[in-house]
């Protein structure tokens, strides 16, 4: 959510500078990442609304199974990244506990998409 700015209009900043090919990835993968992030932060109704509008505008056929795959993947990656903090000696035990809670929440979310 740190790359979504709310002002007069919603602006989504996604600037991949290190690999030009990555800039042109599957749009559905990017939408799935944002949907997962919204749901993680309690914005399920916003996620549902965005998905409805995307689906109506993109007119892609039967992409829900692929959407769920991308959402599982992104949630697992976020959970994994948070899990890495547990072994970081520079992070306080309180911050490690928070990282564990975030990781659990991401892994639980991933499981919900896989059902």
Predicted regions and their residues:
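Active-site acidic catalytic loop and adjacent metal/ATP-binding pocket
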Residues: 1-28
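Active-site activation/catalytic loop segments of kinase-like enzymes and analogous catalytic loops
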Residues: 17, 24-58, 73-90
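Pocket-edge positions in alpha/beta enzyme catalytic cores
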Residues: 23-26, 64, 95
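All-alpha amphipathic helical-bundle segments outside canonical DNA-binding/catalytic cores
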Residues: 60-70
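Amphipathic alpha-helix face/heptad-repeat signature
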Residues: 68-75, 99
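ATP/Mg2+ or Mg2+-diphosphate-binding catalytic cores
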Residues: 80-115
């Amino acid at each position: 959510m740190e790359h979504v700015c709310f002002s007069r209009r919603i602006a989504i900043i996604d600037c991949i500078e290190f690999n030009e090919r990555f800039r042109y990835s599957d749009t559905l993968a990017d939408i799935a990442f944002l949907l997962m992030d919204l749901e993680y932060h309690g914005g399920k109704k916003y996620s549902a609304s965005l998905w409805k509008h995307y689906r109506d505008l993109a007119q892609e056929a039967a992409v829900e199974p692929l959407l769920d795959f991308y959402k599982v993947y992104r949630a697992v990656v976020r959970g994994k990244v948070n899990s890495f903090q547990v072994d970081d000696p520079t992070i306080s035990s309180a911050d490690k506990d928070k990282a564990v809670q975030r990781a659990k929440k991401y892994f639980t979310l991933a499981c919900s998409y896989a059902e």
